[in-house]
Amino acid sequence: MLVFSGSDWCIPCIRFNKQILSDSSFLRFAGENLVLLEADFPQRKKIAAPLRQQYDSLAAAFNPEGAFPQLVLLSPQKKLLAYIPYREETPDGFITTLKHLLQ
């Protein structure tokens, strides 16, 4: 799962990180079912140029509109499976959504 985030300016991104990405039940599920990659686009913090180039390339392919947070489910072959709309929900609710999409 690819997560486009603005870690120091995007309030919904910060919420998603705290409520979902940091939750132990989600981390357990993700460890067994997903490869997680967060492409972070901070405004105040600098990231290394090579990493920024990789994130820009991912954004061009999977987030051309520049939506934040943008949650993208990809196959192991990097095929787009689904865009997952951000909603404030519980970790269990988000896990249920992912399980449905992974079937």
What are these regions (language model features)?
Residues 1-10:
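Short active-site neighborhood of thiol/selenol oxidoreductases, capturing the structured segment around
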Residues 1-2, 36, 71:
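Hydrophobic beta-strand anchors of alpha/beta hydrolase catalytic cores
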Residues 7, 41-42, 76-78:
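Solvent-exposed coil/turn segments that connect beta secondary-structure elements
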Residues 11-13, 46-47, 81-82:
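Extracytoplasmic/secreted cell-surface and envelope-processing proteins
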Residues 12-29:
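Typically the conserved alpha-helix immediately C-terminal to a functionally engaged Cys/Sec
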Residues 19, 60-103:
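Non-catalytic, surface beta->alpha helical segment in thiol-disulfide oxidoreductase systems
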Residues 26-53:
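Thiol-based oxidoreductase modules, predominantly thioredoxin-like and allied folds used
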